[in-house]
């Protein structure tokens, strides 16, 4: 399993805390300082490419779900 960069790891912590949701949901649970929305959205897309997340489109909203458990990563 590929080691995550610090920014990606912080995003995954927010995602694991939230469970599943949109970028906006993850931004609310992101540790301070919170990144700009667009930065977090790009990070989430990268995490999806690395197979850490799965996504499902509902209307014009993407819902992301962790593909691996936090314990599995650590």
PLM feature spans:
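Short acidic, hydrophobic short linear motifs in intrinsically disordered regions
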Residues: 20-30
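Short, hydrophobic-biased segments on the C-terminal half of alpha helices
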Residues: 41-45
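Short beta-strand "wing" residues that participate in macromolecule-binding interfaces
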Residues: 55
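Short, cationic-aromatic polyanion-contact patches
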Residues: 4-7, 58-74
